[in-house]
Amino acid sequence: MDLAEEGSGGLHDFRFEAGGREISGRATWVVDASGRGRFLVRREKLDRPSPIRHGSSFLWVEGLLDPEKCTNLDRKQIRLRSERSALGHFPTFLATNHYCGEGYWFWEIPLHGKTSLGLVFDSANVNFKDVSSPEKLVEWICREYPLYARDLPQRKILYHSGLTSFALDNGQTISPARWALVGEACRFTDPLYSPGGDLISTYCTLVTDAILTRDQKELETKIRFYEPLARAIYEAYVPSFAVSYCTLGDQECFSLRYVWELTVYFSFYVFPFINDLLTEPRFFPAYVRRFSRLGQLNRDLQHFLLAYYRWKKEPVQRPASAPSSTSCRWAACRRPRAPSTRSASLPTRRARCSTGSSSASRRWRASSSPT
């Protein structure tokens, strides 16, 4: 592959072998959709380290694994549960079931004749070596969720794979020289909320519009906005995964972050996309400016949630003396009130959570505080 020089307006030359013969040609555009092979990223040396240090291990087992059978409730108790009525009495195994813990989440998804199970984790909380094989992953699942031991170990394993670190970044997405990256050949954050589909659809929208732009000057003008927008869309996601992944282990903290992230998702991603505004010249200059501020705002909030999570893990301090049994009972049920001046003054303790730095081995120390 010989890429044309930027600004030359020339064509790209390509050559490849197929069926024992060499084929060559010229192209106006080159779009790398090679997935994790990342042909152009490696060729042009565009790779950049991601601050997200997460891994995954996943497998398929034969048959449908029914989570309702992994319970101590009898069939009548299962049938009469109030939440089943709210869900229309649909079998639980028909849904995607997620289980969350400190720095990880685990999925169970029914497929045709088989069940997909997988673990996504912060490397500061789970060691990939502990789940690197199908046997080790099954052992981990049964240890963390013991009722699965009644069924899962007897299932035939059909497929297994894993990634020690799956997040991807690069230095450039699209060029006026008429080449671009899409899909995992470009960037990837984390499977939580499945944002990969959002990045793919957004980047493909920008690349498609660029390909349809015939005038070189107009193309260069668009790319001056498209490139920072593509990076801002990626970087705004990063703090949600790199800073506070351990808050998945607390229902209250996760509920708070979920409401915030759902609001951001629809306001910044969904509504502009479904209204065809991403490539609207009157819209995207202001959109890029707003998006560039979202990343820092999200980072600050994720640090606050992390500090709150660490504070909640502190043991409850009982008063040295209590004037009455009523006040004793009241005090024992309450945690120490957090200072109301600044979030940075919240009491902290060591937590097994990555700070989002380039080193996955870094931990929050007792002296650290949110920024």
Which residues does each PLM region occupy?
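Short, surface-exposed, charge-dense and proline/glycine-enriched linear segments
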Residues: 24-26, 30, 36, 81-88, ...
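A broad "ordered helical/assembly scaffold" signature
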Residues: 1, 8-13, 23, 59-62, ...
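A residue-identity detector for tryptophan
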Residues: 29, 60, 105-107, 140, ...
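C-terminal helical "tail/cap" subdomain of flavin- and related membrane-associated enzymes
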Residues: 210-371
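FAD/FMN-dependent oxidoreductases across multiple families
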Residues: 96, 102-106, 112, 122-245
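Predominantly flavin-linked oxidoreductase catalytic cores and closely associated redox partners
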Residues: 2-147, 204
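Generic preference for well-ordered secondary structure
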Residues: 45, 92, 163-166, 188, ...
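Generic alpha-helix signal with a bias toward terminal, lower-confidence helices
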Residues: 37, 60, 69-73, 118-120, ...
